[in-house]
């Protein structure tokens, strides 16, 4: 759509954008809010997982014309109808509601929601209008003047939020009558309301610090004070749009005690032109404190000082040389300075240097620099004592200026800087990714040198054979052999024996006193003898050594071709994802999926209520999602029903659980279920209760034998998937506690984390970024666990990986590149043993490549993706069902998806061979290209302070969003051909089809509500004691998971989640 045809708004158009409750799929809404901004809208972006009441509160306080919400997790009908109703009830019925959810929202539901006043965009709308066209419709529909309906001044003075919000709109547009304006100013003058100004450099964490200060004020003063926050962000000179990105960072806005308004500068430099009148309106509305936060400023900006009573300047330790402080204008005027992100290198030096600069600026030369109002804070650290010290100092200053404060409940702190922040990665280790890149490149450089040395040795051996007894030749040969490392000489010397062991009809290996026989050849219908592992035919020793060091056979370092010598004969890699409704329905689905397989490989999808650590509830925006797009699990009893009939300790049973934020609690439910199964079997067999020693032995044996994986990858959640619920710091502590508990209890066959690239890819990343970010996250866990004092070989075998497969060429080598980098780094960088060097990974075919148009074509895409995953020796595989673009898969579509794998593994002829990619020129080329691209990305992340440092600046999220934007644009303009979507479209249109939509039934939803309430009633007394103990331990350095294992027996999921919120803090969203 050309710029000349876009609607040019006549009025300031404002939108609230978000993803729905319990929905982390924010790639689409991020694209939409970016285009809204570019077309001139002011966007208040709330991010993912937003309840209806949060969206309504934002719409009212921000006085927007429109709300745009994406919903991909089901429950959309209930959510949008509840949203429209709640807006009307809040006096904001004029706000237009827009939504989208790809093919998940079917035409009948779109029509139903239209009758409720909700405009849903379908995939067909996207094809017809394109991205700019859809956004243009939003802008055009919402280009209305809100100032025509002005509230009475009495309504503002009475504290009505809708009235205050509209008055601010009128003030910004110079549309408030002079009499009303004067009345507000007069009312403001009659009240003593201090104004706290917060300004500072961009990226210093002003919003996070503001949120932490407000949270402390509410806790300390027991919600006796009302606070109005005005957050200013700049208007873009080109286009006039603005990203108003402060509200997304706030976790302290619940209830009616805090009013929050985002303001665009609209032509002003640092502040809107009528900011004083806006502040006065907040005072007149009865608020006790006004906080004004301005955008990031340069060294010479101090405009905020003229509008506030107390001015605070926020900066970080990275200001350069101390002489740069002399150029910062605000240091002449600030009442308080906060050095945020104090945990970074140079934090203490920054506090010292700024204190000395303030002393000079104030000409207080006789004073102690330590008495200057400079605080070292870490707003990202939950309950940081440096922030508390800052809060208590500000409270004194504001109290002196009229803020009616009580004594408060927070104990006084005796520090001015953070003392308790935890360094997850020690400062000395922050360059770990650059070191790994160097390790891998050094390995390959040595390979090139050794290839040349091997070739020289071979040539000289031939010469020596032709000239026996020649001393000069013998001397040259001896020197050449000395240049060949003994390890590499041994590889070449062993090769004939290794090759011979693969040429017979079977290979016999003795393990202790057991003999393992493996058939080496399979016969085709034509009588051809197909080798399970094909061998290279190199005669040149250099090329052979290059193969052995760069690839090698499956099961041999560097494991490029696979971590095991052969695939299991009795177990396909299929691991099918299932979960819908209540535990009983999903249990039945598991039994159907596994009935024809001796190995029971169960992969569990949880509903979004569970994914966000909540219990089922009647509230419409929750109720609609119970048991939808996954199974509802709220208690250990639910978990027992889910896996009833499966022996969780059988060597042929393996359970995968895709859950992240509340993963510790779900894992505790699962392990208790496995233990209770063992105890029940003992009771049934022996007819009595086990003794204490017998029970302990059964527990230990269960933990040692249970097989499976819990995803629990919190780093990728922050970067792409968005089911983080606790603060990142607390979540990482819990991950380390789980792994430490695994080590103590000898849990060797269960993966404590599935380091996942799949969701990074689903959020929009290309295959290189998916692989680089995922491996970088894996190495971050390695460094974090080493820093906790664990030994590499105690925890590395408990790490697994999870990748997406798509249509891009790099997906053909994603597994082999990952295995090679991991093996080289673990051996040569970390000194790990062979078991730790083996990277094992699960593959799921791409959900993003499933399209609602021409859905039958989806199985073709899935088949190709499954083929390359099997060729690359993935350790397990899930093939998506063709109808997942629209609904949770039906039994029929799941059967078809499983058949894809079965046909490849059992019918496809080339699958008789287990290393079909080796020897391909293009695969070799792609492997090297992808590996180098990953190593280069490691260096980029390292430059930003490693994975955690890069996350702090939003590097990974930004890159994923950019790559998602590129894909969507190319899909919509047709330059990326997608068959049946933007090319080769059905000339007769989409055939009418009646899809079976998989949804939880009313009976299942109500049953889950009844079950969790009954569980809580039954365990009320025990739960209170268990939660108190859990909170106590979480405040110390003890292992939380040890106590959680007990608490999980008597507490529901939400009870544990809320306890962890109290002691660990909530996740703070990023734009």
From Swiss-Prot:
InterPro entries: Cbl-dep_enz_cat, Cobalamin-bd, Cobalamin-bd_sf, GTPase/Isobutyryl-CoA_mutase, IcmF, IcmF/GTPase_domain, MeMalonylCoA_mutase_a/b_cat, MMCoA_mutase_a_cat. Residues 401-558 are annotated as: Linker. The gene is icmF. Adenosylcob(III)alamin binds at residue 25. Its EC number is 5.4.99.13, 3.6.5.-. This is Fused isobutyryl-CoA mutase. HAMAP family: IcmF (MF_02050). It catalyses: 2-methylpropanoyl-CoA = butanoyl-CoA; GTP + H2O = GDP + phosphate + H(+). Keywords: Chaperone, Cobalamin, Cobalt, GTP-binding, Hydrolase, Isomerase, Magnesium, Metal-binding, Multifunctional enzyme, Nucleotide-binding. Catalyzes the reversible interconversion of isobutyryl-CoA and n-butyryl-CoA, using radical chemistry. Also exhibits GTPase activity, associated with its G-protein domain (MeaI) that functions as a chaperone that assists cofactor delivery and proper holo-enzyme assembly. Does not exhibit methylmalonyl-CoA mutase (MCM) activity. Mg(2+) 1 binds at residues 207, 246, 293. Mg(2+) 2 binds at residues 232-233, 246, 293-294. Substrate binds at residues 566, 601, 707, 751, 800, 835, 840. Belongs to the IcmF family.
């Amino acid at each position: 759509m050309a710029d000349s045809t876009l609607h040019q708004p006549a009025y300031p158009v404002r939108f609230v954008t978000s993803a729905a409750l319990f929905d982390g799929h924010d790639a689409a809404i991020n694209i939409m809010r970016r285009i809204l901004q570019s077309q001139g809208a002011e966007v208040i972006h709330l991010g993912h997982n937003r309840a209806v009441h949060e969206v309504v509160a934002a719409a009212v306080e921000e006085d927007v014309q429109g709300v745009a919400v994406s919903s991909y997790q089901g429950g959309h009908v209930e959510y949008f109808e509840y949203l429209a109703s709640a807006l009307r009830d809040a006096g904001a019925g004029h706000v237009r509601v827009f939504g989208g959810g790809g093919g998940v929202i079917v035409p009948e539901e779109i029509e139903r929601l239209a009758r409720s006043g909700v405009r849903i965009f379908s995939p067909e709308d996207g094809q017809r209008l394109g991205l700019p066209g859809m956004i243009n419709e939003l802008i055009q529909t919402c280009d209305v003047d809100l100032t025509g309906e002005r509230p009475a001044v009495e309504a503002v003075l009475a504290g009505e939020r809708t009235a205050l919000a509209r008055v601010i709109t009128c003030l910004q547009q110079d549309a408030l009558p002079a009499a009303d304006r004067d009345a507000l100013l007069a009312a403001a003058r009659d009240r003593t309301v201090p104004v706290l100004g917060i300004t500072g450099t961009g990226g210093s964490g002003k919003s996070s610090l503001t949120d932490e200060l407000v949270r402390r004020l509410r806790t300390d003063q027991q919600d006796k004070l009302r606070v109005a926050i005005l957050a200013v962000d700049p208007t873009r000179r080109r286009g006039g749009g603005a990203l108003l990105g402060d509200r997304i960072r706030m976790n302290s806005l619940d209830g009616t005690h805090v009013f929050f308004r985002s303001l665009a500068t609209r032509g002003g430099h640092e502040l809107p032109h009528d900011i004083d009148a806006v502040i006065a309106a907040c005072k007149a509305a009865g608020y006790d404190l006004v906080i004004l936060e301005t955008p990031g400023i340069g060294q010479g900006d101090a405009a905020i000082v003229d509008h506030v009573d107390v001015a605070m300047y926020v900066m970080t330790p990275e200001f350069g040389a101390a002489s740069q402080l002399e150029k910062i204008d605000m240091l002449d005027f600030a009442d308080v300075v906060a050095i945020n992100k104090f945990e970074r290198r140079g934090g203490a030096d920054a506090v010292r240097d700024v204190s000395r600069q303030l002393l000079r600026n104030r000409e207080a030369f006789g004073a102690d620099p330590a008495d200057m109002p400079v605080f070292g804070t870490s707003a990202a650290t939950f309950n940081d004592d440096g922030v508390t010290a800052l809060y208590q100092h500000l409270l004194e200053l504001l109290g002196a200026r009229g803020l009616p404060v009580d004594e408060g409940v927070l104990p006084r702190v005796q520090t001015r800087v953070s003392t308790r922040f935890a360094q997850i990665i020690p400062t000395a280790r922050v360059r770990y990714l650059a070191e790994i890149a160097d390790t891998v490149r050094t390995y390959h450089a040595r390979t090139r040198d050794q290839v040349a040395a091997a070739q020289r040795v071979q040539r000289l051996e031939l010469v020596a054979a032709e000239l026996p007894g020649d001393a000069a030749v013998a001397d040259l040969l001896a020197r050449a052999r000395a240049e060949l490392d003994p390890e590499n000489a041994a590889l070449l010397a062993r090769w004939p024996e290794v090759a011979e062991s693969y040429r017979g009809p079977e290979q016999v290996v003795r393990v202790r006193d057991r003999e393992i026989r493996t058939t080496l050849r399979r016969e085709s219908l034509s009588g051809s003898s197909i080798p399970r592992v094909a061998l290279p035919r190199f005669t040149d020793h250099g090329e052979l050594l290059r193969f052995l060091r760069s690839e090698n056979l499956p099961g041999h370092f560097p494991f490029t071709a696979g971590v095991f010598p052969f695939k299991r004969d009795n177990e396909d890699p299929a691991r099918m994802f299932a979960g819908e409704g209540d535990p009983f329905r999903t249990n039945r689905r598991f039994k159907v999926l596994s009935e024809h397989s001796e190995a029971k490989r169960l992969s569990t999808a949880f509903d979004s209520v569970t994914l966000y650590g909540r219990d089922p509830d009647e509230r419409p925006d929750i109720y609609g999602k119970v048991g939808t797009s996954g199974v509802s699990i709220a208690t250990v009893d639910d978990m027992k029903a889910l896996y009833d009939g499966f022996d969780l300790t059988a060597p042929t049973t393996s359970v995968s659980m895709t859950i992240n934020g509340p993963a510790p609690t779900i894992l505790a439910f699962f392990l208790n279920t496995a233990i209770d199964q063992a105890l029940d079997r003992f009771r049934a067999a022996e007819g009595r209760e086990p003794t204490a020693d017998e029970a302990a032995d059964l527990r230990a044996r269960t933990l040692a034998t249970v097989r499976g994986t819990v995803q629990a990858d919190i780093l990728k959640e922050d970067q792409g998937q968005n089911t983080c619920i606790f603060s990142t710091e607390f979540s990482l502590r819990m991950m380390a506690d789980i792994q430490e508990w695994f080590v103590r209890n000898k849990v060797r066959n269960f993966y404590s984390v599935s380091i996942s690239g799949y969701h990074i890819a689903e959020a929009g990343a290309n295959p290189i970024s998916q692989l680089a970010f995922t491996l970088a996250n894996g190495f971050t866990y390695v460094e974090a666990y080493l820093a906790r004092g664990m030994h590499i070989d105690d925890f590395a075998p408990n790490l697994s990986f999870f990748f997406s497969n798509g249509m891009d060429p790099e997906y053909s080598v994603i597994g082999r590149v990952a295995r090679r980098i991991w093996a080289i780094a673990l051996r040569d960088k970390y000194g790990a043993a062979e078991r730790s060097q083996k990277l094992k990974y699960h593959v799921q075919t791409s959900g993003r490549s499933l399209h609602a148009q021409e859905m039958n074509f989806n199985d073709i895409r899935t088949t190709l993706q499954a083929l390359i995953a099997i060729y690359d020796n993935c350790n397990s595989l899930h093939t998506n069902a063709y109808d997942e673009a629209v609904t949770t898969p039906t039994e029929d579509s799941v059967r078809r998806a499983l058949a894809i794998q079965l046909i490849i593994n059992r019918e496809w002829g080339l699958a008789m061979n287990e290393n079909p990619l080796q020897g391909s020129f293009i695969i070799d080329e792609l492997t090297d290209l992808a590996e180098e691209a990953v190593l280069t990305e490691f260096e980029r992340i390292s430059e930003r302070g490693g994975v955690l440092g890069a996350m702090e600046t939003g590097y990974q999220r930004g890159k994923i969003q950019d790559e998602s934007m590129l894909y969507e644009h190319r899909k919509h303009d047709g330059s990326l051909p997608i068959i049946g979507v933007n090319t080769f479209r059905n000339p007769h249109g989409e055939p009418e089809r009646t899809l079976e939509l998989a949804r939880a039934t009313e009976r299942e939803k109500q049953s889950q509500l009844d079950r969790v309430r009954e569980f809580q009633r039954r365990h009320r007394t025990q739960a209170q004691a268990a939660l108190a103990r859990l909170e106590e331990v979480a405040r110390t350095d003890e292992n939380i998971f040890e106590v959680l294992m007990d608490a999980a027996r008597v507490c529901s999921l939400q009870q544990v989640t809320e306890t962890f919120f109290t002691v660990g803090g909530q996740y703070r969203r990023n734009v």
